[in-house]
Amino acid sequence: MGFPLPAELIARSRAVGEPRWAPGGNFVAWVEGFGPRADVVVAPADGSTPPAVVTAEVGAASIGSYGGGVWCWVGSDHLAVVDADGRLVLVPSGGGPVRVLSDEGRAGAPASSPDGAAIAFLLERDDACDVAVVPVVPLVSGSSRAMAPVRVSHADYAWDPAWAPDGSALAWHEWDLTAMSWDESRIVVAGPDGSRAAVVAGGSGISVGQPRFSPGGGALAYVSDATGWWNVWVADAAGHGAAPLVTEEFEHAEPAWAPGQRSFAWSPDGAAIARCRNEGGFASLVVTARSGGSRALAKGWHHGLDWGGDGIVAVRSGARTAPAVTVTDPGMGDPGMGDRRVLACGAPAGFRAAGLVEPEPVSWPGLDGGTVHGLWFRPERSARGAGTLPPLLVDIHGGPTGQAAVQWKPWHQYFVTRGWAVLAPDPRGSTGHGRAYTRALAGRWGSLDVEDCAAGLARIGPAGWGDPERVAVTGSSAGGLTALLLAAHHGERIRAVVSRYAVTDLLGLAETTHRLESRYLDRIVGELPRDADRYRDRSPVTHAGAIRIPTLVLQGDADRVVPPAQAVALVDAIRAAGGTVEHHVYAGEGHGFAREETILDMYARTEAFLRKWVLDA
């Protein structure tokens, strides 16, 4: 039997992401983050020496909470990095002075031209997010500044530029603010100066992303949900003759909340593509030859794929596996599986998988008869003793386009190893189950998701998922809205609710959130001012007086997505109605908690709260 997962191990874990082979395949670099600090590190591919931090002078942008697209190689001896202040800088891979390439706005998703003479990147300002190109010119008179970047895109949002191998073209992913990228978006191919721009994929009702030219330059691959599922498509370099690499009812991408997603990679010879296949929350690394035929190499989620050197480098994780930078050899090992080595692990020393649990897929009928999916974690022992049903924690993901995926989720394992069962629902609106499942939430956020989770609550006893008399609900961000509405409308089935940086006021969110989500609610709630009453009715703050179960509200004071005032308004309304509520604000934390001391407090505070109101009540 395993031991409870210590909060200290969770709090001391590092984030790892965006691994890339250096040209030539002798080195690998990736991003490591601890707390609010992130850096790019470089290591020999054979692991002969420890990774070396190359951004100590300037830091690197975060890869979590909407962060991503942090860096790229520029030749084999430099890196273009988005530093901690959002500038684009040039960093020598072996150490040396840092050069500023652009300090206009905030940079992201850099991509070097094949000759290293220019960097394409996204340049975000208050009113625009464009693909821009900046030349990498020699220093003049000791200046550390380069030339001004030139905008080449013209949509509301443009991300993830990619160069053709001969430097003659750029491709990128763009969309307009009347939609989110997973609603509808476009792949554009243009000259490096933006000339001859042509939309080659996507458009009305179709979501696309991750454009990537083949190493030889004869083909362009990207993800598209034109079949109803995010599959990898391949066209010629001009975007003509597109067809899916395979047509599967599995997703091969996640919603693009941030730039830099790499869920597939070309082989060095362009003859095959490696892809992470989402199998209803579980996942596999699969290689498919362009001539036909697929081979599963490894189980588990693989993010940030890059194929070079002696294999496929990625960040691998699973329910019992903390994220690690791994290299999988696609040509060796047992049939169906590739050999794998670990270059870096996010978990600190002392991490053990003993006692951690693999979830089981579950489903139940929604109140309207539709099928709702989820994952159920069964603990090795019940927190209430042998022979008893375990208390159940229902944890609702954010988004609401998130997914209860079989990835490393320490929140779930923390409670499972303490004798709680965990149900992680995927109410409709979640991704991972096809486009129709996601788009079923159109106009119904705050209603259908609540109904789907309520139907799950009704199944707890009959399905034996846990003790129906000892149920707690937790949720973060969009999932916090669903959790709080469940507490208001179905509180008779719940003992306590925990909200982490939750949306509580939809009208307020529409007025104050950041630009990326400024029109998000148009599709999943309704258009303003026409549907203002719907916004009010779907807001937890409107129903605060009906929340009669104990409530814990956790919030960061630096949250740019959900302003802290939303938590304050909810807490004040619950207290005014005579409800029981605890409220804690974490200094310096944004939309998602990162600091070691915050994480330690969050787990301790939540565990004490649930013990008081669920286990000991």
Q: Each PLM stretch: what is its role?
A:
Residues 4-41, 69-70:
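Beta-strand-rich domains and repeat architectures in extracellular enzymes and scaffolds
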Residues 427-617:
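Active-site-proximal cap/loop segments of hydrolase catalytic domains
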Residues 19-27, 71-77, 110-118, 161-169, ...:
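Blade-terminus and WD-like Trp-Asp/Gly-His loop motifs, strongest in beta-propeller folds
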Residues 5-10, 52-54, 58-61, 97-102, ...:
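A short beta-strand motif characteristic of beta-propeller blades
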Residues 346, 350-469, 476, 509-515:
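Cap/lid segment of the alpha/beta-hydrolase catalytic domain
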Residues 17-20, 38-39, 108, 122-123, ...:
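Non-catalytic accessory segments flanking enzyme active sites
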Residues 50-76:
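Blade-loop segments of beta-propeller domains
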Residues 31-41, 59-65, 80-89, 102-107, ...:
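A flexible loop/linker signature enriched in serine peptidases of the S9 family
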